Amino acid sequence: MSNYLKTRYSEDKRPHTSYPAELVNYLFQRFNLKPSMKLLEPGVGRGEFLREFKKLGLEVVGLDISPEAKDLSPDLHIVIEDSDSIKLPFDDNSFDVIYSKSFIEHLHNPSFFLNEAYRIIKPQGLLITLTPDWEVQYKKFYDDYTHITPFTSVSLEEIQKACGFKDVKVFKFRQLPLLWKYPFLNLLSILISPFVPLRTTNKYLRWSWELMLVSSGVVPKKK
């Protein structure tokens, strides 16, 4: 895994764009998040999403297995730990929100992580997870050699319920901000998607057919 983050998130491969700010603002409104909430992002990468949550007034902490994450985000509080198999270095009921994007599919043991997430989220706190939709992306899911555990909408819902989360909801999601404002345009994406090359490098064409799963789960009052 040496240099994985610096290679995966190089400016050549993934130049900085306005997308993190657009997605974070969408999620902030969609899930009724509030400034001053304490948020943890596992799989923080280069910190671009976490940084946007911080701009909105949340108290943020990042978590990553790679020490490179600290080098990529010296302005953020980043904790280095293997969240796949080791108890997370946080007290019970520490966070209002745990948010992750393109993280849970990298885990050998997602149930272990979700049980830990349940432990450290406060009662009535929220888990927000974004992960590729296996039913749509199975042909190229393993193009990223670090992908391990795929999810469907059913399995993503069931694993969270099994780990104690309540009011679990999962919906399919295209990563095109225009579609969030004008959902009727999803029909156009559906119509053109069969004609988009599987491994197109044009992100707008790619995102017209790639679907993500977005899930949310609430931690109930604990005994």
What are these regions (language model features)?
Residues 128, 158, 169-223:
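A C-terminal cap/extension of S-adenosyl-L-methionine-dependent methyltransferases
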Residues 148-163:
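Short alpha-helix
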Residues 60, 127-128:
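A short hydrophobic/small-residue beta-strand
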Residues 107-112, 139:
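Short N-terminal helix/helix-N-cap motif within the alpha/beta-hydrolase-1
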Residues 1-91, 97-101, 111-114, 173, ...:
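Conserved N-terminal segment of class I S-adenosyl-L-methionine
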